[in-house]
């Protein structure tokens, strides 16, 4: 079958032919319709330090997708041929303390689709049926294809009560923008997002944020004053991994504020711990999506009127995959869809 794979330990990704995956007793086989390019896929393309330590070569990559069930393992219940599905990209063990305790997203033995095992940039994907999620009929293929990153956004945004709260999102990548849209949709008062990329900030404005702030051109304190905020932000969502952005977020938080961190900062990042301690801030790390509460919330948010369509900015056939990766690497894109049909 046709697949996109990391074939060489160098920059790039290549179209190739690989054997169709084998179906296990507890698996389903999915014929891929659409995939989306993740920031992780760009890291793998760039062959950065993380990729060199993590990705075995060769490896079929990709983990954002939607498709149709075409084969079912003999032990599988609850799925039928023809079901439209996406799926959780973290394959968990089922027997560690967190899995058995209902905290499956924190499984210490997690294996990543398209990272540690063959991924979705292929004509067919096999995953455990446990990981598959049926897509409701009133959700489009394109939106279903970005459920994985949308889930990161939902998990981060819904970490804390948002109704009537003021929220600061640092980092206007696609996940940060979707998180900001979720906050606004569920009842936050002011949702402010910061970045230095004007293309992405314009995209955030289209998604309905209160203010999209280029911190190279505007002072965040001035924006807060303009909005009538006198005590700081109640909730902070750190999506950038950039130390200056996190420091600015800490400085802008209200006393007793709550922070969810999805962005991965450098290991040697320094911050003013007085901001954390004397403000009594609560900081929560975010990994993946809660299985599967986040997935049900995703579907419900879209069905209740949350419009994510502006975040999808580019569409290519799979044979034009290089243009898709070029768009992602340019910084002037939202989500990029690759069509396999």
UniProtKB/Swiss-Prot annotation:
Catalytic reactions on record: L-threonine + NAD(+) = (2S)-2-amino-3-oxobutanoate + NADH + H(+)
Keyword vocabulary terms for this entry: Cytoplasm, Metal-binding, NAD, Oxidoreductase, Zinc
Highest taxon above the source species: Bacteria
Marked site positions, Important for catalytic activity for the proton relay mechanism but does not participate directly in the coordination of zinc atom: 148
SUPFAM superfamilies: GroES-like, NAD(P)-binding Rossmann-fold domains
Cofactor: Zn(2+)
Compartments, as annotated in UniProt: Cytoplasm
The family this protein is said to belong to: Belongs to the zinc-containing alcohol dehydrogenase family.
Pathway where it operates: Amino-acid degradation; L-threonine degradation via oxydo-reductase pathway; glycine from L-threonine: step 1/2
Binding locations of NAD(+): 175, 195, 200, 262-264, 286-287
Function: Catalyzes the NAD(+)-dependent oxidation of L-threonine to 2-amino-3-ketobutyrate.
Entry annotation: catalytic residues: 40, 43
First-tier enzyme category under EC: oxidoreductase
Residues noted as binding Zn(2+) 2 in the record, renumbered to the chain: 93, 96, 99, 107
Name recorded for this polypeptide: L-threonine 3-dehydrogenase
Ligand binding (Zn(2+) 1): 38, 63-64
Pfam families, A to Z: ADH_N (PF08240), ADH_zinc_N (PF00107)
GO cellular component entries: cytoplasm
Single Gene Ontology BP annotation: L-threonine catabolic process to glycine
Entry's cofactor comment: Binds 2 Zn(2+) ions per subunit.
Gene Ontology MF term list: L-threonine 3-dehydrogenase activity; zinc ion binding
Quaternary organization: Homotetramer.
EC numbers: 1.1.1.103
